[in-house]
């Protein structure tokens, strides 16, 4: 196989650069093994190579392990490897640019010499940024944002090259060699271009101040670049454009990196989006998803990672959010709803490509759960086969724990979350808390029926609850405590205070079913069938039943939680009028100061506003036409006017939730609010012409 160095520098293979197509092939073949749960094979295949591609591959392997498990030691290893990859790629990019005019130098039709190394650099920077933001150090998080900015500049430069290529290809004015040279000149990457090995490729004067960067709806040059180069998104891997594996690597990599960047930034909650807005970053979900779909077409490491990212997004985030854009058609261009057939085909492709991986089995389970097949979702995760990759095994057990929780299989739920404690150190306080909550449900079921069984579960719940608080705060995100750690510590402190005040055991001071409350936070009700939802209502009803001797002592806060969670169940049952009535009478009619104060659940207000908005969104005639549901409230009212009224009211509630002062779990609820406001904006844009 010919050396890339001989193409770049006009040298014979024997004396060429260490960078080669062989190295790129080893990156593709070896690093991809981790997606088949073969981490040892991935490490061994990349261990001896010294090229930038090998360095990147080692960084990718560590990064995947780090982001699957969130363990600090693995994150440190990933950070070190990615720094090496970034430095190596910068050096090789500099060499490629310096020798770009050597005799017989190979020129891509699309990209300037050294672009493949610029992409390696950008990929390393993006992965470093993610690791930095996940790091417990605020300093490392800030460094992560800076690396994100540098990666953006590089990726924008690559997209400008694609834009130039498509423009000239369409005009037919230049032959491929001339086109490459023209692209090189227009991007400022000729032989005379000065390059610092520590900085990324700079195309078309893109070295802007951070505050000037804008990846949003404004008609900037960057937008024009992406819009024009989007013509390439219609080209499949077998297109003549992608005859060279280097071009395949650059195109798929640039689409994946820029796509994931746009998608992730578009998803951040209001508090973080303000920070990103200040430094000039704004996301674009639709554009990002289209670029990820394009990257997933390619049969390489990048294609597989893009597929994993999208399956996680659609089966996790989309199914977590209740207010999402309406599907516009069954065409491939519609990416913001839930393109089920495309996702099923993509998952089948990945299962075939990686038959030994529990990771893709996990994604199949998530897809089943997202489509209300919780029993099948749980069954897929209860097999005997185990992943040799600890991080994948931890994910499998965690997902099994959640599914058991949604299905009200309390013993399995508790056992599985306790198993998570040994597999992952990210949020052990939460694992113990949910395990204890499951025993609260078993305790309440046994009350009045089996005293010894009730005592056993009460003791187990108490043990787990008291184990949880000391573990809270051990892990941090951007130097802040994890949201659920804060929640768990406060919640148990609240119950301990009530137990002391009421002179009752801790298990009797617990309020509204904590499992149902946790299902609400994970949006598990949207994954349930009618039978499962009816079971949830029965468990919630216990609070007001004669079996609960302490309900009369409860104040408006705990009663508000009951009405909020009950309303969420009713919404999932498509009983919107009942749900809205509970929210209005139980929460919105009260002064919000009732839910603010020491040990109080101050998330109730914003969560109730989001729930009201979700009901209104689901009452729209368009939503009912697509998803089914109850008959219209006012059949005589004009459908278009009814739709507009529902959207207007929905937006009002969302804006109130978005403006809410800081509260517990604001990042988690904020994710849903951000996605919802984007869906409303998309609806308004689509309907502005008919207003």
Swiss-Prot record:
Any one of the GO CC terms? nucleus
Pfam families to which the protein is assigned, alphabetical: Iml2-TPR_39 (PF10300)
Instruction: Please provide the record's keywords in A-Z order.
Output: Cytoplasm, Nucleus, Phosphoprotein
* UniProt-annotated location(s): Cytoplasm; Nucleus
Residues annotated as coiled-coil are: none
Region: Disordered; residue ranges are 170-230
Q: Entry's InterPro entries?
A: Iml2/TPR_39
Q: What is its main location?
A: cytoplasm
Q: How does it assemble?
A: Interacts with lipid droplet proteins.
Protein role = Inclusion body (IB) resident protein that interacts strongly with lipid droplet (LD) proteins. Involved in LD-mediated IB clearing after protein folding stress, probably by enabling access to the IBs of an LD-stored soluble sterol derivative that acts as a chaperone in inclusion clearing.
Say which family it is in.
Belongs to the IML2 family.
Q: What is the protein name given in its UniProt record?
A: Inclusion body clearance protein iml2
